Design a protein with these regions (language model features):
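A structural signal for short, hydrophobic/glycine-enriched beta-strand patches
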Residues: 1-160
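A transmembrane-helix-recognition feature enriched in membrane-embedded lipid enzymes
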Residues: 166-188
Length: 189
């Protein structure tokens, strides 16, 4: 169970829950398997009505810089009736490091401010560690869980699911190690 503070100064929602290419191709919002980043953020936006809100997510593609997650997320939030004028949509970042850095530059958090970061559970450590390295303490709000709290070893013959989990896990471990070696974080665990 996630225990949240009564008041926070800001929410940082990491991109990665939309598919900008398909959204543009079919002229409708296209969400992916990390949609919980958007869905759960709605609850926090409604709970913390005075908080600053930054959605961070650019393109990640050098060839298609206008295919950014922030633009599609803004459309999503508008469609469900949230006031997007009170939100900041950062659309230049291309990776988690830039998500946190650019958001910090926008937020300009004071020392005692409380900020919550919303991202997938498998991705949370990287976001938190980048914040730590840049003197920004973030409270984690993990979503998009792929495993139960209590690990139970059992034979699972669902090959596609197993490959997907292995890909996600290896991607994050490589990312944690690479960011540590590049000096973007101070630790990997």
């Amino acid at each position: 169970e996630i225990i949240l503070p009564d008041e926070v100064d800001g929410l940082m929602i990491l991109g990665g829950a939309t598919n900008p290419f398909l959204s543009d191709e079919f002229n409708q919002i296209n969400l992916n398997g990390s949609v919980e980043r958007l869905v759960e953020s709605i609850t926090l936006i409604k709970k913390y009505t005075e908080a600053k809100i930054i959605f961070t997510g650019g393109s990640g593609s050098i060839k298609k810089p206008k295919m950014d997650h922030a633009r599609i997320a803004k459309q999503f939030f508008m469609q469900i009736g949230l006031d997007t004028d009170k939100m900041i949509f950062e659309n230049k970042s291309r990776n988690t490091y830039e998500n946190v850095l650019y958001s910090k530059n926008i937020a300009k958090p004071k020392k005692n401010e409380k900020w919550i970061v919303i991202t997938s559970a498998f991705h949370m450590n990287r976001a938190i560690f980048i914040g730590e390295k840049n003197n920004w303490t973030l409270t984690p709000y993990a979503v998009d869980f792929t495993q139960p709290k209590k690990f139970i070893f059992k034979l699972n013959l669902n090959l596609l699911n197993n490959l997907n989990l292995m890909q996600r896990g290896s991607h994050e471990w490589i990312g944690l190690m690479a960011y540590y070696l590049m000096g973007r974080t101070s630790r990997i665990l």
